[in-house]
């Protein structure tokens, strides 16, 4: 199963992410982990997948794109992750507007979304 992991740049609860991803991976058998290659949740997810030998597909916004179109670059990257990455599942950790944008786009595209709340019992 192809999974896209997203969450805030300030997300730092590695323990929560490890618990959630380990459980979901056991249930669903992730074959690829897609992420936006930003600090925070994306970095933790990348390290998690690396430790488990799960191939990673990072979608970084090129600096020139940030310079040229500013904050519009993030939503364009989010759409690329969905269009090119073709995830079967989105796992969304706590975050801000970018995370909400990924979730909204995934729902619109018919991709299953699992939203993680810090209060969830993992």
For the regions a protein language model found, what residue spans apply to each?
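Acidic/glycine-enriched connector segments
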Residues: 11-122
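Residues that mark the start of a beta-strand
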Residues: 1-2
């Amino acid at each position: 199963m192809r999974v896209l992991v997203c969450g805030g740049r300030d997300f730092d609860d590695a323990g929560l992410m490890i618990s959630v991803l380990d459980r979901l991976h056991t249930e669903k058998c992730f074959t690829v982990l897609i992420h936006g290659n930003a600090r925070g949740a994306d970095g933790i997810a990348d390290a998690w997948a690396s430790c488990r030998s799960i191939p990673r597909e990072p979608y970084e916004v090129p600096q020139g794109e940030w310079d040229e179109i500013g904050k519009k670059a993030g939503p364009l990257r989010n759409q690329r992750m969905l269009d090119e990455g073709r995830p079967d599942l989105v796992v969304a950790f706590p975050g801000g507007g970018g995370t909400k944008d990924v979730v909204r786009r995934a729902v619109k595209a018919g991709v299953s979304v699992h939203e993680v709340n810090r209060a969830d019992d993992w």
